[in-house]
Structures are given as C-alpha cells and as structure tokens.
Regions:
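Core dinuclear metal-dependent hydrolase active-site scaffold
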Residues: 1-53, 134-198, 325-332, 338, ...
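Pre-active-site segment of Zn-dependent metallo-hydrolases
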Residues: 11, 21-81, 85-137, 189-199, ...
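Active-site neighborhood of phospho(di)ester-bond hydrolases with catalytic His/Asp-centered motifs
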Residues: 29-31, 55-64, 71, 83-86, ...
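Short secondary-structure boundary/capping segments
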Residues: 44, 99-103, 107-111, 225-227, ...
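Metallo-beta-lactamase
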Residues: 100-164, 295-334
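Cap/insert and terminal regions of metallo-dependent hydrolase folds
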Residues: 169, 190-279, 365-370, 389-455
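Hard-cation-handling environments
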Residues: 231-376
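Hydrophobic, well-ordered secondary-structure elements that form the walls
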Residues: 351, 433, 458
Length: 470
C-alpha cells in the first residue's frame, strides 16, 4: 500500500493525499483547491497529478474549499466514485462548491477581457456553478463515530475535530490479506473551546497518521483577552472615531462565530444597540441557515443559550445582506457600523469592495480574524511595517485605516492544542507520522515539538512524494 502527497505538502492549501491499496483501490483523502498563490493558483489547480477516472473514493474531512474545492473539477474530468463525508459537510458543500464555481466564472470573465485586449484566446474556468451542482449526486454521508464499509476490505468513520460544522478526522481501516492497517487523517484540527462547536474528540490508535500543522509554530492568544480586544476595537472605531469596522471573514464558521459573539455582547449590554451590524455575504447567509439545522452539533454553552434564545445568530441590530444593491449602499453610507463580509483572506467577494471604499479613511478599521495565505491582500495588509499603499482591483489605495489582527478566533488549534489532540495516540506504536497542511517553518517547528513528546518516524512530504505503508 502506498500514499502519495499531491497537495498541502509543505504549504497550507490544496489538500489531496492519494492512497493506493495492494488490491488496486485508489482513495483520495480530500480534494482541495490551492488558494492564495496569485497567478500561479489557476495553473496549480489544473495540474492535478492524478487521473480522476481511476479514483474509487474521495474521503472528505470537511467542506472548506482548500479541502473540497476540486471535487467538481475531478467529476468534470471523469471521477465517478463516491464522496464520503458527514451530513453537515455535504450540506455545506452544496452551497460552497456552487459559490466557488460562480466566483470562478466571474473571475475568468474579467481575466478574459484583459486577454482579449492583448489578442490572446479566452480561457475557461476550472469549473462552473453548474458543474458544481452536478457533482453533488456523488456524495454519500455517514454520521460521526459510525463505520461505513466502502467494500469488503475497506471501512471509514469520522471523529469530530471541532474545526467546522461536520468536520471529522477520517479513520480508514484497510484489510489486505488478513492484515488490518488503520490510517488516521486529522484533516483540520479545531480549538479545544470553540465558541459554537464541541471540542475535538479522541480517535482510535492508528498505524499511520497524517496531521495538519497550520499553526505548528504558534500559540494563540487567550480568548477572553481577544473578546476584550474586539470590544475595544469596536468602541474605538464605531463610537470614538464614528467610522466603519470591516471584518473580512470566512463565510462559513468564522462568520457564525463572530455573529454569536456579538449577539452575546449585545445581550449582556456590552455594546450600544445603535451600532448596526451587517453580514454582507450571500454564502454566509445560506451557511447560517445550515448551522441552524445542526444545533445538535453545538457545544453545551450554545445549547443552554438556545433554551432562552432560540436563535444564536440573530439580534435587533443585525442585518443579513443578500441583495447586491444593498451591499453597494453600505459602501456609500457614512454611518458607523460593523460589516462582516467574505472572503477572509480579502482576495475575493464583496469585502474587497468594502476595503477599497474604506481603506483610505483614517476613521475606519479593518480587522483580520483568520489565516491569510502569502500573496493575498490580507497578508499584505498585515505586513510589518504596514504598507503605505495596496493594489485593489488594479488601483492603488493609501492605507490610512487602522489594521488589526486577532488570531484567537482561528478555527485551527495552535501547536499545544494539536499535540494535546494527538495525546490519544501511543507515539511508540505509530509507524509513520506525516505532517501536512502547513508552511515549512511551521511544519519543522511542530516536528521538533512532537519529538519532545516522544514521537518518532516523522516525515514532512514534498509535493508528489510517495511512501510505502507496510
């Protein structure tokens, strides 16, 4: 049996890891898009290094696009197998994948206008919204902690990782000639005290382990301090300066967490009712409806709140924005307000327009609350020192607004939380551990920390590198 690391190898995005059994079955762990690589992204996503027609199963740990985003493209190229995931993951993919296809169509239309002016032929998007909807028939779901038999020799189950609604550590059990091998793939590891979701759960002992390292060299700040910092930023921006606070946020999970937190602030009287809050992202609006459907996956604090407040994602000052004209009106308003909008890395979506219209006004603030990949607008704004100007939609803008970052809202555990998550394993019995989904510096630091905890045979695969699983 072999495993080949196709994506998220010495980088964060593009998760794809191909297992080939001795019986010839091909199982792809996640099928994610590369993101945040500028002009290289499109080429990287088209160079998939595997024949989709030969893949029997895609095991999907969660719905984030850097893990799920190429499923429509693989289907377009001939993949006819099953996509196995939890029910919540399927429901989130049903809105996130078409949204990604829609964005690609719009981006390619803009790109082709430039190509036509240069006398170059038009290019096609990797896939369209229609392509994304067509692949949803391939999805097969299984609830947490229940094994699903893929065939007589292979079964899979998911243990909750607390990273995203429906996210799970995939546990594969593969029988080859009477010998059972268990492979654990963490996907993305969540926080121990998520605002909405249950904490990550232990998982069975594995012979081979594939683990992420997004924040393999970082410790998050305390969440209580982060909440106070958020309150201070809101008060300074919206009350003292009478400006706008733009919060670029991932439409799924992070937006719902921030809305839940603001709901608590308002109910506790920590924020004045007069500050309006807008969630300006159609995808976030749709995702919030799906979150409401899966209240059983919330942690005990949220469940207790629901007993007296049935909607954790609604309060008087909150408006969900779908209409594009209403979104444009937010750019024109001079009223102090909070605008939560996608995308979190500030590379696409309505938030780029809000930033372009707000960044030159010193009364305004931009607050980053999640990971921003290198080369993205978010990463450029967070650079130290702050850049004097940035390019948005091909135009230079002076960076006069205050730029803030709070990393405690991250959906990824820091290295101590990840090590604690792996404490359910006996390191001496794990034959090989593969570190993926991290920048090289984070992976190397995390590897050293694991060694201190008694882990050995740790590998950081290169893109395309293949290993025997004996």
């Amino acid at each position: 049996m072999k495993i080949k690391f196709i994506g998220a190898a010495q980088e964060v995005t593009g998760s794809k890891h191909l297992i080939t059994t001795d019986h010839g079955k091909k199982i792809l762990l996640d099928c994610g898009m590369f993101q945040g690589k500028g002009l290289e992204t499109d080429a990287a996503n088209r160079n998939i290094m595997v024949n989709p027609e030969e893949i029997d199963y895609i095991i999907l740990t969660h719905a984030h696009i850097d893990h799920s985003g190429l499923i429509p493209y693989f289907h377009k190229l001939g993949f006819k197998g099953e996509v196995v995931c939890t029910p919540a993951t399927k429901d989130l993919c049903s809105i996130m994948l078409p949204d990604t296809g829609f964005i690609q169509e719009n981006d390619m239309e803009w790109f082709n206008k430039k190509r036509r002016k240069q006398g170059l032929p038009a290019m096609q998007p990797i896939y369209t919204e229609k392509d994304a909807r067509a692949c949803m028939d391939l999805f097969v779901t299984v609830s947490y902690n229940r094994y699903l038999y893929l065939d007589n020799n292979i079964k899979v189950k998911f243990n909750n990782t607390g990273h995203l609604l429906g996210s799970g550590c995939a546990i594969l059990e593969i029988d080859e000639g009477g010998k059972m091998t268990r492979i654990g793939y963490t996907g993305d590891i969540g926080r121990e005290h998520n605002y909405l979701l249950r904490s990550p759960e232990p998982f069975p002992h594995c012979d081979y382990l594939i683990t992420e390292a997004t924040y393999g060299n970082r410790l998050h700040s305390d969440r209580a301090n982060a909440e106070q910092q958020l309150l201070e930023i809101i008060y300074h921006t919206c009350v003292e300066k009478r400006g706008k606070l733009i919060i670029p946020s991932f439409a799924v999970s992070r937006t719902q967490e921030i809305v839940y937190l603001l709901n608590n602030f308002y109910s506790q009287g920590k924020l004045p009712e007069k500050i309006p809050v807008y969630v300006d992202s159609p995808l976030a609006v749709n995702a919030t409806e799906i979150f409401r459907m899966y209240a059983d996956l919330f942690n005990d604090d949220v469940k207790d709140m629901i007993e007296y407040n049935p909607d954790p994602f609604g309060f008087n000052s909150l408006t969900f924005v779908r209409d594009i004209n209403q979104s444009k009106a937010l750019n024109a308003t001079k009223q102090p307000c909070i605008i939560i909008s996608a995308s979190g890395m500030m590379e696409a979506g309505r938030v780029k327009h809000h930033i372009a219209n707000s960044i030159e006004n010193p009364n305004n603030s931009i607050l980053a609350i999640g990971y921003c990949a290198p080369t993205t607008l978010g990463a450029k704004l967070l650079a130290n020192p702050k850049p004097p100007t940035v390019s948005i939609f091909g135009m230079e803008h002076s960076v006069n607004a205050d730029i803030y970052e709070i990393d405690a809202f991250s959906g990824h555990g820091d290295y101590k939380e990840m090590i604690n998550y792996l404490s359910c394993q006996d390191p001496s019995k794990v034959k090989k551990t593969f570190i993926v989904h991290g920048d090289p510096e984070a992976q190397q630091f995390y590897k050293r920390q694991l060694r201190k905890e008694g882990w050995d045979n740790i590998f950081i695969p290169e893109p395309g590198e293949e290993f025997e699983l004996k």
